[in-house]
Amino acid sequence: MAEPESSTAAAGGSRLRNACGGVLCAFTLLLIGVLAFSIRLFSVIKYESVIHEFDPYFNFRVTQFLSKNGIYEFWNWFDDRTWYPLGRVIGGTVYPGLTLTAGTIWWLLNSLNIPLSVETVCVFTAPIFSANASWATYLLTKEAKGTGAGLMAAAILAMVPSYISRSVAGSYDNEAVAIFALIFTFYLYVKTLNTGSLFYATLNALSYFYMVCSWGGYTFIINLIPIHVLLCIVTGRYSSRLYIAYAPLVILGTLLAALVPVVGFNAVMTSEHFASFLVFIILHVVALVYYIKGLLTPRLFKVAMTLVITVGLAVCFAVIAILIALVASSPTKGWSGRSLSLLDPTYASKYIPIIASVSEHQPPTWPSYFMDINVLAFLIPAGIISCFLPLSDASSFVVLYLVTAVYFSGVMVRLMLVLAPAACILSGIALSEAFDVLTRSVKYQLSKLFDDSPAASGDSSAESSSASTVSTNSAKNETRPEKTETAPKEKPSKKNRKKEKEVAESVPVKPKKEKKLLVLPMEASVLGILLLIVLGGFYVVHCVWAAAEAYSAPSIVLTSRSRDGLHVFDDFREAYAWLSHNTDVDDKVASWWDYGYQTTAMANRTVIVDNNTWNNTHIATVGTAMSSPEKAAWEIFNSLDVKYVLVVFGGLVGYPSDDINKFLWMVRIGGGVFPHIKEPDYLRDGNYRVDAQGTPTMLNCLMYKLCYYRFVETDGKGFDRVRGYEIGKKHFKLTHFEEVFTTHHWMVRIYKLKPQKNRVRGKLKKLKSGSKASSTNAAGRKKNPWQ
């Protein structure tokens, strides 16, 4: 009766332990979610509830329109306040995931009588989904390496600076929800791989659909998963679970992706998606081979194998030929400009300068890796090693995700955001394995220390004898069933016989060797735990600093510290408020495309170009106007019905991201469409200068005049704090533009086009002067015989 009671007590204890572990795990995940949300609120605490950057202002404006007019009007919205006189169809050119998500949250809160404004919901959408991303990271890592690694990875992702940079409160951009969708799609794919459940496969397709709605980076998913499927096939890991995980994703995911207006038929017509279809065909060929192998004898299987391979190769070659024909018909070979710039990092700088001009599309520097992922860079190799011990479908997918993300992040700094989850997952796995080994070593050493104590020496002989008898009996009992189990399995083939022998011989010996290898000395284990805790402390301090100082400042409100304290530069909102209150509603404002979204959203004025950059010719026209002399620029702007021109200037306060520093991109983009604009005309010996050594073309262009007009009056010298020298042309007047507003710190300057002169009056003057000249020279002039 004692043995059943002890077994039931042990079972009850294990159930209680599992229940307590589940509650503790849920509570830890809740704390991780709170951490992920709260660490992103520094921007609201330090400044106010304000939208950040440039693109979020367009998303905020679209969300306002959706909440006010409904989803039907949203899909059919033609915006006449952007890209004048062309306009823009919003419903068919925007990824609607972020807008629909925030609009749904706003509708639910107002349905529950929680009257929050649309702006407040937009500001806090990114912190909310950062918590969701942390929980999705836990689920993905748990499928790969267990609960401990999942909790560690979730905690690391909640604080990683690379993700914080795009998910602070106010950063209302597509990546705010897309990173969660990316991680959750990967989790459902791995979950389907591990379970073979068609339910999870369907959820995976729906999650992929949400990712397509949210961000153009969905092409990373539809290319990474086929690569992993192909890797599993090549390494002999094909199974029915792999088929269930991939086939529904391609079919359902492609059909759902085609429903998104901004994607449409691109889901089946562009080169970014062709790899998924090719792997889909290969997967079916492999599945057919495995199916036939189970039905036929070995001799018939060889004949059928050759037939299937022949037909499969013929089909693959036919599909490849069709794809090549489709790709060859496109000038960009079926790839988008951004995709080509990822495959060939020099493509954008050679052919599409508008893409290369965006700072997010530049390659990162080495310090940016240590800034954005910090100590995780040193933990990733250990995580890779842990994934190979042992290697599973889930762990191989995580390693493949890391390798591809590292490459793409090295091409484009914006894709550091895609690298962050992979780095956190592998770092979490490495830390979990390290803590597991170190704590087990400490536990073993402590138990050994207590077992060797004098108090327990009296019972040691009896316990050792009983333990030895039990161990010998258990060893015998363990070896016997192994022999009986391996005996019938030795029949099929020699390879299986060798494998089963190796497994049978290694099973009873392996645990003893592992225990000896994993046990470390007490001092080394305690020191290792302390070092890992200190390393984690440094990581937390760095993440909090990055969240509070580096990534919380909105670009529309700038701050600077000096001996006098903190100085706030609110020039952008000051300029947009002036435009809103002192200009007509239908007035057109011209500026470089960086400020188009903000001008439309905050000043409610029509702009010529904005951050969508869908029409390179229109942007080149504005760049040409800025690069031209004053009169030629006035004619270009006047042809576009422009009434005001806005420029950003940082020479007085030292703001480096001004239009003078961006000017060469205007020249390059304008020169790509209008050949008379040549970059060497603006350079002196290959150097870009605006001082006395600047070229006449540079010192007489419109951008120079609008930025430096009356600048010499500030200090009497015209010293530019950004460039670090005095300007070349200090005293000049404007003939076709007049200054109407300059902000407090001279960061934003607004000019108005002067009206056209009275042409009738000018003609009369010319006629009078012409008649006098003709009368005086008539005597000495001979008559033209051809008149």
Curated annotation (Swiss-Prot):
Spell out where the chain is glycosylated. Answer: 604, 611, 615
Q: How does it assemble?
A: Component of the oligosaccharyltransferase (OST) complex.
Q: Which family does it belong to?
A: Belongs to the STT3 family.
Q: Provide the E.C. number(s) assigned to this enzyme.
A: 2.4.99.18
What InterPro entries does this protein map onto? Oligo_trans_STT3, STT3-PglB_core, STT3_N
**GO CC terms for this protein?**
endoplasmic reticulum membrane
Main subcellular localization, coarse class? endoplasmic reticulum
Keywords from the UniProt entry:
Endoplasmic reticulum, Glycoprotein, Glycosyltransferase, Magnesium, Manganese, Membrane, Metal-binding, Transferase, Transmembrane, Transmembrane helix
- Residue ranges that the UniProt entry lists as topological domain Cytoplasmic: 1-18, 145-146, 196-197, 235-239, 294-306, 389-394, 438-525
Q: Give the enzyme class.
A: transferase
Chain span(s) of sequence motif SVSE motif: 357-360
Q: In which pathway does it act?
A: Protein modification; protein glycosylation
Cite the binding residues for Mn(2+). 55, 173, 175
The region called Disordered is annotated at 453-507, 759-787
Species name: Oryza sativa subsp. japonica (Rice)
**Positions that bind dolichyl diphosphooligosaccharide:** 414, 597
Where does the chain cross the membrane? 19-39, 126-144, 147-164, 176-195, 198-212, 218-234, 240-265, 274-293, 307-327, 366-388, 395-411, 416-437, 526-546
The chemistry this enzyme catalyses reads: a di-trans,poly-cis-dolichyl diphosphooligosaccharide + L-asparaginyl-[protein] = N(4)-(oligosaccharide-(1->4)-N-acetyl-beta-D-glucosaminyl-(1->4)-N-acetyl-beta-D-glucosaminyl)-L-asparaginyl-[protein] + a di-trans,poly-cis-dolichyl diphosphate + H(+)
Q: Name one Pfam family in it.
A: STT3
Where are stretches of biased composition, namely Basic and acidic residues?
Answer: 477-504
Q: Which residues lie on this side of the membrane: Lumenal?
A: 40-125, 165-175, 213-217, 266-273, 328-365, 412-415, 547-787
Protein's name according to its UniProt entry: Dolichyl-diphosphooligosaccharide--protein glycosyltransferase subunit STT3A
Q: Where is this site: Interacts with target acceptor peptide in protein substrate?
A: 55, 360, 662
Compositionally biased spans, kind Basic residues: 759-769
